[in-house]
Amino acid sequence: MAEVEALPGLKQPVDDAGLLEDANQVHTLVIPSGHIWRVELSSDEKLSLKVTAGIGEIFGTELANNVEYTFWDWKFGIYAVEELEIEWKCPQLHDRELSIVENTTAHNVYNLHFALEKMRSSTFDGPRIMVVGEKNTGKTALCRTLCSYAIKNKPYQPMFVNLNPVEPIFSPPGCVTAVPISSTLDAQLPRWGETMTSGATRLHGKQPIIKNFGFETIAENRSLYKLVTKKLFETVSERLQNDSLVHRSGCIVDSPPLENCDDEYSELVEAIVGLRINYLIILCNDNDKGREIYTKVSKIVNTYVGERLLRVPTMAGVFEKDDVYIRAQQRAAIREYFYGDTRTVLSPYNLGCDTSDITVWRPKSVLQGENTNLDTLEVAPVDSSTLQYALVAITYASRKSDSEEVLQAPILGFGLITELNEKRNKLKILLPVPGRLPPNAMILTSFRYLE
């Protein structure tokens, strides 16, 4: 027994062996068929579990039996397709009441999946669906599940498109992305998996198409958002046209929350037109608010999708994501881009250079009082208040390119300005790979990361 010194008069014996035993204590949980174990973990909580009997899945990805999975800093659900027995250990969860709820929307998801399968098998033009809804309705969960189901038993490669810059999926935050889902998604990662830049990984890495928006909310610059998504739509359409397997597999599009769109839902309309969406799925419950949302959306999109607007209830077991959780996920995505995670450790390169060696552009924001020429860039001042700890997108455009060329250029990758000395005109920038600093223009994002 060790004794911990505290405030005078407050000495409490602590059983070190007991603490260690509690941390490694294995618990057994049986989840009834058709139910979800809702798991909520903070950044300092680690859950290890192993399926010992039954069939369970996380967002459509089946968990292998007798394989240990590790989770942290995530809110997710484990669905028991049939009665599921799990061995788990997590000292922080030990004293909590576990949340197990019935999956009341499983049949809706299955019906959608089988309808999409029928379309893929009956025509060369695969289904192009977009999921819309308000925050915390399960849009991303439904998209991920449908992608996982599509590749489970057939050699399909559906194109997943993320139009919500808040969600860092296969990219740092502030991006809109598209990626053909050709293999199993990593059930342990909220960001769906790892990309080809992570090197050797246990699961096949994905190669996403990434367009940098740079802001968290669409409202900060709607003109720029529409310009960036238009470029994404063009690239996705070209890929669908040139890849017959992806074309037949179709598109699954995760839209930004309805609250983030303008009153006319013009962002949704442009996505419907740009990606030639033929089915729109709206997540809302059958109550007064849900019917009001459905009516408003249907009036606006009726011209484009007609009767192919489907109402599906809000996904069962969905979590509410507050700002603290969202910031934690964005921070984790930036960290993993440069450093990897506990299973795939990366070694970024910290490079020193003169401030005169870089040219950083920044988009305008209505939150800063900008109201004109919002779809153009301006040169950012090279000072600590602007660039310190900033995430920057490195473009293919040269440093001498003008605003329009930089805005239209594809993204080479991302860098993180870790230090800036204004007196010496020196800075340090973290890059994913070693080598010289590319002589390319950079675009400042609104995201910061401090170790």
From Swiss-Prot:
GO terms for molecular function: ATP binding; polynucleotide 5'-hydroxyl-kinase activity. Transmembrane segments: none annotated. Its main location: nucleus. It is found in: Nucleus. ATP binds at K75, N136, T137, G138, K139, T140, A141. Pfam families: Clp1, CLP1_N, CLP1_P. It comes from the Eukaryota. Required for endonucleolytic cleavage during polyadenylation-dependent pre-mRNA 3'-end formation. GO terms for cellular component: mRNA cleavage factor complex. The keyword Disulfide bond does not apply. InterPro entries: Clp1, Clp1/Grc3, Clp1_C, Clp1_C_sf, Clp1_N, Clp1_N_sf, CLP1_P, P-loop_NTPase. This is mRNA cleavage and polyadenylation factor CLP1. Component of a pre-mRNA cleavage factor complex. Interacts directly with PCF11. It comes from Candida glabrata (strain ATCC 2001 / BCRC 20586 / JCM 3761 / NBRC 0622 / NRRL Y-65 / CBS 138) (Yeast). GO terms for biological process: mRNA 3'-end processing; tRNA splicing, via endonucleolytic cleavage and ligation. Belongs to the Clp1 family. Clp1 subfamily. The keyword Nucleotide-binding applies. Keywords: ATP-binding, mRNA processing, Nucleotide-binding, Nucleus. PANTHER family: CLEAVAGE/POLYADENYLATION FACTOR IA SUBUNIT CLP1P (PTHR12755), POLYRIBONUCLEOTIDE 5'-HYDROXYL-KINASE CLP1 (PTHR12755:SF6).
